[in-house]
Design a protein with these regions (language model features):
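Flavin (FAD/FMN)-binding glycine-rich loop and adjacent Rossmann-like elements that form
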Residues: 1-194
Length: 196
């Protein structure tokens, strides 16, 4: 994803472009860091950083280019942007977080094009926001395979933000009442921003 592009800048004032790499090739699948001993968490975080650096090296030296060549040697990490010594992120991106047990749980049947057999997602009277993205699940530490399913423009129902048993607690981002499958379209940043 391009974070900073040259297009909006006047000629001669263009900054170096900045991109975020969030590809399945960069997904660390050898273990998770939830509810693990500090030593195990440190091990997995270090291995994930090593994977990121390996992918970056491949991009610089071996990635196929449109002109038939290989490698993009002009790519470099940006410690000044990321605020880290190596230019990698400060923390890993957790694609699927823990979710609340909500008063309402969004499922694939509410938003999936094929599952609905319709051109419209379910209409929620208590909608607090909208979103639109495919149901996109990357492989996981459980060795689940990649899933990419069409979804429909959907709403964020308030009931998915209200826990069953807790008071004075609202979820943020990916923590709403959704299933593993429906989380694949509710987890995207624009939808997270709508959730809060």
């Amino acid at each position: 994803r391009r974070l900073i592009g040259r297009a909006p800048y006047a000629a001669g004032c263009e900054p170096h472009e900045v991109a975020l790499v969030n590809w399945p090739q960069n997904d660390y699948l050898e273990g998770n860091i939830i509810d693990k001993a500090p030593e195990e968490v440190a091990h997995h975080l270090e291995q994930a950083r090593a994977l990121s650096l390996c992918l970056f090296y491949w991009m610089q030296t071996e990635a196929p280019r449109p002109d038939g060549g290989v490698g993009f040697p002009g790519l470099y990490l940006r410690p000044d942007v990321m605020g880290t010594d190596d230019g990698l992120s400060k923390a890993p991106y957790i694609r699927e977080a823990r979710r609340i047990r909500a008063r309402f749980t969004v499922t694939e049947e509410h938003v999936g094009r094929e599952a609905r057999g319709s051109d419209q997602a379910v209409y929620f009277k208590d909608s607090v926001g909208v979103g639109c993205y495919r149901i996109d699940l990357h492989p996981s530490t459980g060795r689940d395979n990649y899933i990419d399913v069409s979804s429909l423009p959907f709403q964020i129902p308030l009931g998915a933000l209200i826990p069953e048993r807790m008071e004075n607690l609202l979820p943020a981002c990916k923590n709403i009442g959704s299933t593993h499958i429906s989380n694949g379209c509710y987890r995207l940043h624009p939808v997270e921003w709508n959730i809060g």
